[in-house]
C-alpha cells in the first residue's frame, strides 16, 4: 500500500499527461529539427573537409573552436535580455519586447566588432596555441596555414550570424519556433550545396578546399539572416513587437540597468564557459595532432546527438519563463520537475544509440587509425555521461528562467574554470595518464554540479517574476 502511494506520488511529480508532452514537444521539436539539421550538415561539412586530409580538418576545427567562443558570447549577450523578453511576452507587453530586442542589437554589435578586431590582430597566435603537441614541422605549418585561410573568410559571416541570433531568439521567446527552423533548413541546404561545389571544385566551380567550406558557411548565414528578418517584418500581425521596431534604437536606462544586472553575469558565464571549453581542447591537444583530429570527429558527432537535451533545456527557459512571467509559480515548479525528468529519460535512450554506433562514425573520415580509435572511445565516454549532461542543462535553464544569473555564473563557468580546467591542465602536462582517462575525469567532475543543481532547483530559489519585481 505504501509503495503504491510512493509510485503515485512519483508519477504525479515527474510524469505528465499526453497534453503536457504535446505542449513540450511543440516547443522542443522545431528547435531540435533546426539544431539537428544544422549539426548534421556540420557533420557532412566536417566529413567533406576530413576527406581532403587531416591537416585541413584540424585547421578548420581549431578555428571553429575559437569562433565557438564568439558564438556563445552572442548567445550570452542576447540571453540576458531574453529572460525579460519571455516574461514580457507572458504579460503581453509588446513594447517591453521591442526594448529588449534593441538591447540585444547593441550588445551583439559591440561583441561582434570586438571579436573581428581580436581575430584580425592575434588570430594566428590563437591557432598556434593548439599546435604545441606531437607532429612534424610540416604538419604543424600546414595546419596553421589552412586554419588562417579558413578564419579570414569566416569573419565575414559574423554580422549575419549576429542578426540571426537577435531575431531568432526573440521569435522563440515569443513562442515562434517554426520560422527560425525553416530559415535554418534553407540555409543548411545552401551550405551543403556550396560545400560540395567549392570544396571539391564540381562543374565549373574552383576547387577551394577549406576556403570553399568557409565561403559556403558565410553564404548560408546571409541567406538565413535575409529569411528571418524579412519574414519577421512581413508578418507583424504575428510579431507585434516588429511594429515600429526601428523607430528608435534607444533603450530606457532603467531597463538597461535591470538587464545588465541580470544579463552581465550571463554574458560573462557564456564567454568564460566557451573559453574554458577552448582551454580544455588546448589541454588535450598537448598530447598531439591525432588528439586534435579525434576531438574534432567526436565533438561533431556529439553535437548531432546533443540536440535533444539542448532543445529540451531551451524549452525549459521558454515555457517556465512564460509561466513565471504570468505569476503562476505552482504550475512553473510542477512543469519544471516534469521537463527535467523528461529530458533525462529521453537522453538516456539517445545515449544508448550513440554508444552502440560509436565505432561506425570515425570510419567516415579520411584520417589515420589512431585518430579514428581515439574518436570512437571519446564518443563512447560522452554517451555514458549524456544523462548527466541533460540534467545539468535543464537545471541551468531552470535557474536562468527565474533570473538567477549570478547563481548560474557560479554554477557553470566558475565551476569549469576552478575544477574542470585545472584537472585537465594538471593531468595533461604533469602526468602520463592517457588522454581518454583525462577526458573521463573531467566529465566525472560534473557530478558535483549535479548535486548543487538538484539542491538549488528543489529549494525553488528561481521561482520569481523579474519583470514585475
Regions flagged by a language model, labelled:
Residues 1-28, 85-157, 207-263, 320-385, ...:
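Short alpha-helical transmembrane segments in multi-pass integral membrane proteins
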Residues 26-45, 153, 187, 220-224, ...:
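Transmembrane helical elements of multi-pass membrane transporters/channels
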Residues 32, 36, 40, 44, ...:
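Generic alpha-helical transmembrane segments of integral inner-membrane proteins
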Residues 33, 45-49, 60, 85-90, ...:
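Hydrophobic/aromatic residues within transmembrane alpha-helices of membrane transport systems
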Residues 36, 40-58, 127-141, 199-208, ...:
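Helix-terminus/linker motif at the lipid-water interface of multi-pass membrane proteins
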Residues 54-65, 147, 151, 214, ...:
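Small-residue hotspots at the loop-to-helix junctions and early N-terminal turns
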Residues 57-117, 161-180, 281, 292-358, ...:
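Small-residue-rich hydrophobic transmembrane alpha-helices
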Residues 78, 153-172, 180-188, 213-229, ...:
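Short runs within selected transmembrane alpha-helices of multi-pass transporters and secretion channels
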